[in-house]
Amino acid sequence: MSRRRVVITGIGPITCVGHGREDFWNGILAEKSGINKIVSFDPSAFRVRCAGEIRDWDPEVFFPPHRLKRLDRYAQFAVASAKLALDDAQFEYSREKPQHRVGVSFGTALGGVCKAEDQYIRYLKKGARGVQPTLAVQVFGGSAHSNIAIEFGFRGVGTTNSNSCASGTVSVGEALRYIRDDFADVIVAGGAEAPLTTITVGAFDIIKTMSRWSGDPALACRPFDLLRDGFVIGEGATSLIIEELEHARARKARIYAEVLGYSLNNDAFHMTAPLPSGDSCIRAMRDALADAQLAPGEIDYINAHASSTQLNDGAETMSIKQVFGKDAQRIPVSGTKGYYAHPLGATGAIEAALCTLALDRQWIPPTINYQNPDPACDLDVVPNHGRKAQLNYIMSNSFGFGGINACVILGRVR
């Protein structure tokens, strides 16, 4: 029995380098970082000074005022990105005519932490009477996927995962499984995060995982660079319309790429450090290749997790060499977080969108801010400038806190 084939028909990024498909892609082509100084709160109590902050966000473009009272910032990003993706896919929706074969698979690491901190401050100042009565339904992690389903009338599969930095990739991979196994025909898959709060930045600063770069903020995130000193936190969301191939063809949808393979596993080792042997990362890539029914040498480009930490980038390089052998030196491997920072649970979805566009446009995005080669990261990291290439198959890695490893493989539709 042949497997149901699964494709991507809509893309809706909201990041610090652009909102919507073309704005985002133009930001990538510009080869400049969207990272800047934090302005949403005073970071002077911390050694962290910069983030991938979305300064031009205007929620009233997407929502009437009464809706905003019930949406945390991360849920605003989620619902807005879903609308961008649905419109890009030219997919018809209506709350008055709900659809039972259309679902939502979304990811977030921290959910409504922004609203939680805001309301806790209100509680300290005014007591319980100062707290919004809708607080409970704004802060829980599932509020993003629930609000997407409510907004657009999708009554099919509904799920939220909170797999740290791998959440967005997991949401895409699980959408593949739901559709392949005939639980749905269409899934809105993605991730959203709005973690720029004192409690979140402070917590990561304490454990010394974030960059303490004090120079030009645009240079703070330096994947694979010898002098990288930690990840840069960001915010945003991306939704992808994941659809069964014949369903997409029947409605004459534009098809960007096919979702071919997915894997998910755990290091079972440490909350912040990767498994020294790289065994689980290696298995994740090999399992995704097996699911996609591809040989390692067929991959044309790898979008690495490459969070700009000393441990992660080196460990990922070692794992790629183990999986791809002699092909590891030939296959371009870029880390793209220098553009949009690391929006935690949204990152994997952002990178899935970037890989989808790379396939569609036949162009490999670079590792920007690469200045000092690291002998431990001796791959073709596509330094500073992108390049045209013949791309048929792309792998995207997400290796998150807690040792959660996810990998998806995309390809051109044949």
Regions found by a protein language model. Name each.
Residues 125-132, 170-173, 177, 194-250, ...:
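Glycine-/small-residue-rich "gating" segment that lines the acyl/pantetheine channel
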Residues 1-67, 246-258, 353-367, 411-414:
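ACP-dependent fatty acid/polyketide chain-elongation machinery
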Residues 5-9, 36, 215-292, 300-301:
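Condensing-enzyme catalytic core mediating Claisen C-C bond formation in acyl metabolism
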Residues 78-91, 141-145, 149-152, 157-193, ...:
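Active-site-proximal alpha-helical scaffold in enzymes
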Residues 39, 183-229, 262-276, 306-313, ...:
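Acyl-CoA/ACP chain-elongation machinery
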Residues 10, 28, 82, 104, ...:
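Conserved small-residue
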Residues 8, 23-24, 32-163, 192-201, ...:
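Conserved beta-ketoacyl condensing-enzyme motif
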Residues 42, 85-98, 247-255, 284-301, ...:
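Phosphate/pyrophosphate-binding loops at sites that engage ATP/ADP/AMP, CoA/4′-phosphopantetheine
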